[in-house]
Amino acid sequence: MRLTALLSMAAKVALPHGYRYGTNRPWTIAARRLNPPGKRRRKVFVEPIANEDWPVVRGDTVEVLSGKEKGKQGKVAQVIRARNWVILEGLNTHYRYVGRSGDYRGTYLASEAPLLLKDIALIDPTDRKPTEIQWRYTEEGERVRVSVRTGRIIPKPVFQRKDGIVPQQWKDGPKDTSPEDTLQKTYTPSLKTLEEEVMEKMNIQENRRPRKSYWY
């Protein structure tokens, strides 16, 4: 595991009581604008689903079951478990202007709106049709998703970070620090100052003595 992954796991955002989740990350400016301090918003009731029972992960191929995009298949770009939302690449989009000013009308952009988990279904790799799933265990004890219609195992896609790096396929380059070097203890605490440690390491002898000074 790389150092950046360890630091991201250690960092946790403390959210106030009654915080309403959206499509933006809680630490972004857009999320703070929707949840200003002192403002109480109506509670949104969400069907509880355990993290280990979530049937869809980022990178899955699903089909839309209802709405204007019904029957279309797409790839899951983002999963928001706090609201049972799933965002698909290029589907269920709405258009808006961003950065509008007095003389400039702004940039016309497409933005994907979230879909509820009940409005999508996983695609069976056997026939490329939507299917319900069940959680089962293999002979090796691995918990997998199984299609109810065909009994085919639906494998999870390879985990890919936001920057496009696949941790399982990553190879350290000449400028990367290996985990072994990162975890190695190279500093020995002492009561010496930084200057004294540098002088000792470089074998510098300081024979000068400061003169006495007097304050009047």
Swiss-Prot record:
Subcellular location(s) per record: Mitochondrion
Pfam families in the record: KOW (PF00467), ribosomal_L24 (PF17136)
Transit peptide residues according to the UniProt entry: 1-9
Start and end residues of each KOW domain: 56-89
GO terms of biological process kind: ATP biosynthetic process; cellular respiration; translation
Gene Ontology CC terms, in alphabetical order: mitochondrial large ribosomal subunit; mitochondrion
A single GO molecular function term of this UniProt record: structural constituent of ribosome
Domain of life: Eukaryota
Main localization of the protein described in the UniProt heading: mitochondrion
Entry-linked PROSITE patterns: RIBOSOMAL_L24 (PS01108)
This protein's UniProt keywords: Mitochondrion, Ribonucleoprotein, Ribosomal protein, Transit peptide
Region (Disordered): 167-186
Signal peptide annotation: none
Coiled coil: none
Subunit structure: Component of the mitochondrial ribosome large subunit (39S) which comprises a 16S rRNA and about 50 distinct proteins.
Family indicated by similarity: Belongs to the universal ribosomal protein uL24 family.
Name of protein: Large ribosomal subunit protein uL24m
Protein source organism: Danio rerio
Protein encoded by which gene: mrpl24
